[in-house]
Design a protein with these regions (language model features):
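Short alpha-helix in the alpha/beta-hydrolase fold that links the catalytic acid
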Residues: 449, 463-473
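Glycine-rich nucleophile elbow surrounding the catalytic serine of serine-hydrolase chemistry
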Residues: 225-238
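Catalytic histidine-centered segment of alpha/beta-hydrolase-like enzymes
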Residues: 490-501
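Alpha/beta-hydrolase fold catalytic core
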Residues: 316-461
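Alpha/beta-hydrolase fold nucleophile elbow
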Residues: 216-228
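Alpha/beta-hydrolase active-site loop
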Residues: 157-160, 167, 191-212
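A catalytic-pocket lid/entrance helix-loop region that shapes and gates access to the active site
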Residues: 131-136, 237, 241-334
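N-terminal cap/lid subdomain of alpha/beta-hydrolase-fold enzymes
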Residues: 37-45, 86-189, 472
Length: 528
């Protein structure tokens, strides 16, 4: 059974809200009219495609998670972003899942989920990771037809409610015209939305409104972000505490960026090697001794070499001794699957792009960037980087039809607005990125706040050893190390695409939620 509701508005106010909404609709003030190619100085066309600024559709569902029946509702809709003058400047599209076969969800954990980009919709984790429905793919994550969705038997909806948020210009979220009908200029839009700190600021306001409307202030709250979404949620942790007075229980960083923690020079170059080794192992390009080891037995050996031998050698640059250079060169070649000549020509600093092109060059294949299990075919075997990203083209095969079908046909959200898998958010202001320090400070201020990092061993864009390095550097005092954890998976950037890792990563989330929930009556306090 499906129904449309004024979701989040108390019943005794719904009649007044309905009248108010009708009036606004009559005056055309509640409808965003956007033309696909409208420019900053054009008036909005009378024949533009329409999306409502503030609406919701609720559908009721039932599924099985870990073998047990779970009833839930799915709310799809839009909620405005207001400026300081209380004028709507954007509307964000979201999907909100609530378990309905529980007596009271006001104290149930709430997961607020963001993807990255910047400029990416929330589609990836929504229909492939934590949501109750996931796209049709095979057990390793490759697309299959017919496209569509299926039950996610490992979804965390059994233990937490989830809202998937699409930032401005992603999904169905859009910038709104000004009062005179013209769109804000590109510069105005960037100041409001498209930058590290602007993004954090408006999303914190939006989250506050969402939590208030849906009566979730008493719920333990968690942020989960993937890729650039980890920059977003790291900054949001402090912004929510200091500007919205909303304190969290946990932050989950999936395939994290550097979150403003610099790793340049020798560290940046050396940190790639463990990822090179994992990928070479996967493609059977290591010698028999290394290839016969399990991946999790091999990687600690490579990590130890990286920290204790490779970084010191790179730090010495052109002054490294010939003997030390030969030793390091031989070990790098052994662990990476690349030739000593190729590594030497790059002065021990091999780029990921070259690795993707060179590892299987003799077979005429290239490697995927976000997931190096995927293979591509270039026009020429020569060159220093692949022609295209094999994994991304593969993913778009299945994700694009799945989300468009699912929202319209199963969740009953119908609009002619295009669903932006990737939206126009550039140029993105990356200045003053202190999100790692923001997360550290949020943890220091909030003894309840825990952080978990999840990363795939075959991710070449945000590699797993960089993720470990970020965790190590996040709190150099070591005083909060018991609230920081790392989980690795035998897949890539979206580790949950591999069926075994979908199961394990969701279980890791369940454990993280359970362990970050303080015992009843336990105070948020540091003890001597």
């Amino acid at each position: 059974m499906r129904k449309i509701s004024l979701h989040g508005i108390p019943k005794n106010r719904r009649k007044r809200a309905s009248i108010f909404t009708f009036c606004l609709l009559t005056l055309s003030l509640c409808t965003l009219e956007l033309h696909a190619e409208v420019s900053a100085d054009q008036n909005v066309s009378a024949h533009a495609r329409n999306i409502e600024i503030d609406n919701s559709v609720v559908t009721e569902h039932e599924t099985k998670i870990l073998g047990k029946r779970v009833k839930y509702s799915a709310t799809t809709g839009t909620q405005p972003v207001w400026n300081g003058d209380s004028d709507p400047v954007a509307t964000l599209f979201y999907t909100y899942y609530q378990r309905t076969d529980v007596k009271d969800n006001t104290t149930r954990p709430l997961i607020i989920s963001f993807n990255g980009g910047p400029g990416s919709a929330s589609v990836w984790m929504h229909v492939a990771y934590t949501g109750p429905r996931i796209l049709n793919i095979d057990s390793e994550g490759y697309p299959v037809q017919p496209y569509g969705v299926q039950t996610n038997p490992y979804s965390i909806l059994d233990v937490a409610d989830i809202v998937f948020v699409n930032p401005v210009n992603t999904g169905y979220s859009r910038v709104l015209p000004k009062a005179d009908g013209t769109m804000p200029s590109k510069n105005e839009q960037q100041k409001m939305f498209f930058g590290v700190n602007a993004d954090i600021s408006y999303l914190a306001e939006w989250v506050n409104t969402f939590v208030t409307r849906n009566n979730r202030w008493r719920s333990p709250k968690y942020l989960i972000g993937e890729s650039y979404g980890t920059t977003r949620v790291s900054g949001l942790a402090l912004e929510l505490q200091n500007r919205q007075w909303m304190y969290l229980n946990g932050v989950v960083l999936v395939s994290p960026t550097d979150i403003g923690i610099e790793r340049n020079g020798p560290v940046k170059a050396a940190n790639r090697l463990p990822y090179f080794a994992a990928t070479a192992w996967y493609h059977n390009r290591l010698d028999e001794t290394l290839q016969s080891k399990d991946l999790l037995d091999l990687l600690p050996e490579v990590e130890d070499f990286t920290i204790n031998e490779l970084i010191p050698a790179l730090a010495k640059g052109g002054f490294v001794s010939e003997n030390e250079k030969r030793t390091v060169l031989a070990k790098m070649a052994r662990y990476s699957g690349l030739s000593e000549a190729a590594i030497s020509q790059n002065n021990l600093d091999v780029s990921t792009a070259f690795f993707w092109k060179d590892l299987l060059r003799d077979e005429g294949k290239t490697l995927g960037r976000l997931d190096s299990r995927y293979l591509g075919i270039d026009a020429k075997q020569s060159g220093d980087r692949p022609d295209y990203w094999a994994e991304l083209t593969s993913w778009l095969h299945s994700f694009t039809p799945a989300i468009n079908y699912y929202l319209r046909e199963e969740l009953n959200y119908k609009t002619d607005i295009k669903y932006n898998m990737f939206g126009n958010v550039h140029p993105w202001d990356r200045s003053n990125n202190n999100t790692g320090e923001n997360l550290r400070l949020a943890m220091a201020q909030n003894p309840y706040l825990n952080v978990m990092i999840q990363a795939g061993y075959y991710d070449g864009a945000t590699n797993y050893f960089d993720a470990k390095y970020t965790m190590w550097q996040l709190d150099q005092s070591g005083n909060m190390r018991d609230r920081l954890s790392f989980k690795g998976y035998r897949s890539g950037h979206m580790m949950y695409l591999r069926r075994d890792d979908l199961k394990q990563s969701n279980q890791d989330l369940r454990t993280f939620i359970a362990e970050s929930m303080p015992a009843k009556g336990e105070p948020a306090i540091y003890r001597r």
